[in-house]
């Protein structure tokens, strides 16, 4: 039979159980899973020119939750995957430095004097995604998927702490980026 990745079973099981009040979901991926594993995705992520990123700009917030992608890269691909993994430092560089360069944000993506100092301090051993939940917090009660993560100790934007242990500090040093 086809052997599928452990993460698929974990997603189907979820962590809300009977107490999620109908807010859970079942997601059945079919792309890049034809052989019952994610080896094709590993090959793509391993390519030296690959810049991993995923977003649809919020167009389908009631069906998918792409905001979990960076955490998935670090937990599944660097730490937990059974089989070939990817080095954490390569994934962080790809998500920070390589992505910033690709979109012309040359003052971000690495730590150096004079740069913005946008930093995530992560406890990689505690890093985990929680099961997606349906929330109704958009205008007119519109729904979207929310997926929380644990293990982010602090987030700094322009050197100021904006989140500590998942709680917003109230600091808003960010600014709108225009192309």
Task: Name each model-derived stretch.
Residues 1-85:
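Active-site neighborhoods of metal-dependent hydrolases
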Residues 10-15, 81, 99, 103, ...:
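A generic secondary-structure signal for well-formed alpha-helical elements
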Residues 43-50, 55, 121-175:
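C-terminal cap of metal-dependent C-N hydrolases
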Residues 27-36, 41, 87-90, 100-134:
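Acidic, glycine-enriched loop/beta-strand segments at the rims
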Residues 67, 71-85, 92-94, 124-136, ...:
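Feature captures the catalytic cores and cofactor-binding loops of soluble hydro-lyases/lyases
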Residues 1-7, 87-96, 111:
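Short, well-structured alpha-helical segments that form the helix of a local strand-helix-strand
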Residues 69-73, 170-173, 178:
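Cofactor-binding beta-sheet edge motifs in enzyme active sites
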Residues 94-98, 117-118, 156-158:
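Mid-to-C-terminal alpha-helical segments outside catalytic/metal-binding sites
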């Amino acid at each position: 039979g086809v052997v599928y990745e452990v993460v698929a079973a974990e997603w189907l099981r979820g962590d809300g159980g009977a107490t999620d009040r109908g807010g859970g979901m079942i997601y059945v991926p079919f792309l890049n899973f034809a052989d019952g594993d994610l080896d094709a995705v590993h090959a793509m992520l391993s390519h030296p020119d690959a810049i991993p990123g995923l977003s649809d700009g919020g167009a389908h917030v009631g069906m998918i939750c792409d905001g979990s992608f960076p955490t998935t890269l670090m937990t599944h691909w660097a730490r937990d995957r059974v089989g070939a993994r990817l080095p954490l430092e390569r994934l962080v560089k790809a998500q920070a430095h390589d992505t910033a360069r690709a979109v012309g944000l040359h003052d971000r993506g690495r730590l150096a004097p004079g740069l913005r100092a946008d930093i995530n301090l992560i406890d990689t051993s505690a890093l985990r995604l929680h099961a997606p939940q349906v929330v109704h917090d958009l205008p007119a009660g519109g729904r979207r998927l929310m997926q929380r993560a644990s293990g982010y100790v602090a987030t700094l934007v322009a050197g100021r702490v904006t989140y500590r242990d998942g709680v917003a500090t109230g600091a808003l040093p960010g600014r709108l980026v225009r192309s």
